[in-house]
């Protein structure tokens, strides 16, 4: 980074020039290139460890499935999809998509090992969620109240008013809230 600075020499002459704010002999592009080189030389586990350390990860990485970095090789997932087809490391399969759902499916697919187990998981997964429960936002469906609030027959119906109280007429209400004007001595004179 450079800043323009005017220097007044002892003879009264002014000299204009650019003065570097960096240490002498070091340009900012050189610093950036050195940082870039250091980051590229780090391995993926080192970077992940540093990120977890900075973020204060409380062991969540052990509970959650690992999502590969963009440049990381996914040899196990390509071999599990089809054992006969070999894909070059670093390239994605044509049907492979990015996202949380797909990465979770890859992790479960790696542990199951066979296509039959994957089919059982997908069939079991479709049975747990009932699509009839979720309606469109724009539809006029009546929502099942019991599903959200439980059995409403158990809840007692409370009357609005207690049976001992009677309805007050307008005249009675006004007479209760009437404030008489104070008599002033000046008006009586």
Swiss-Prot record:
PANTHER family listed in its UniProt record: UPF0688 PROTEIN C1ORF174 (PTHR28491:SF1)
Keyword Nucleus attributed: yes
GO cellular component: nucleus
Residues that span the membrane, as ranges: none
Sequence ranges of Basic and acidic residues compositional bias: 59-73, 93-103
A Pfam family that the UniProt record links to this protein: UPF0688
Domain of life: Eukaryota
Region feature (Disordered): 53-137
Localization in the cell: Nucleus
This protein's UniProt keywords: Nucleus
Sequence similarity: Belongs to the UPF0688 family.
The protein, known as: UPF0688 protein C1orf174 homolog
